Amino acid sequence: MENQKDVEAEPEITPEMIQSTFKALEAEGLIRYMKGGAYLPTEKGWKLLREVVSGREKIIGYGHEKIIAKDENCFEITKNKKPRGEDSVIAVRADKGCKDLNERFKAAAKTANRMFITIEAGDVTENITAYGSPALRLTDANEIVVRKSDFIDGKTVAILADKSANEFSKEMKKALKNPKTEVKITLEIK
């Protein structure tokens, strides 16, 4: 029987560890994201590691004077006319919830590939990188949430994001507090 001191415990793997590992691989040239997928270098050139299924979705929402955008874990877009006390809301009166997203985009989001998110409010832009997941449900009719963690529920559209509502610029937060501001959110997997 093996001595228990010789057995290594499995490390607890966090979403941050996975994200930093892939960033390190990319920085070292050990993985490359190109048209069609993620590639690894081999003796004969680049080999496809994972095919990227592309998809794109645009969502339109609006600012609101009660938007505070202070959540440290996520940001949320809602069809509601005003935030209901959530500090994650960045846009209200959205034209779509997760359930309304087009089928091509939903299929692409479920491949665990990188998602590029652009939020435009007036002349201010925020860019976020996150990931899809085969576990995404995309069933909520009212909300869309992008999370820094790997938690998934019916309103989650992306996980392991590099930015939460709290990390948006002061200029963006100011623009989001104006009810006249049209907020354009683009979700793209390419």
State where each predicted segment sits:
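Short acidic, hydrophobic short linear motifs in intrinsically disordered regions
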Residues: 1-10
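N-terminal targeting and processing segments
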Residues: 51-86, 92-93
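Eukaryotic, polar/proline-rich low-complexity intrinsically disordered regions
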Residues: 54-60, 66, 70, 118-127, ...
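Short, cationic-aromatic polyanion-contact patches
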Residues: 36-53
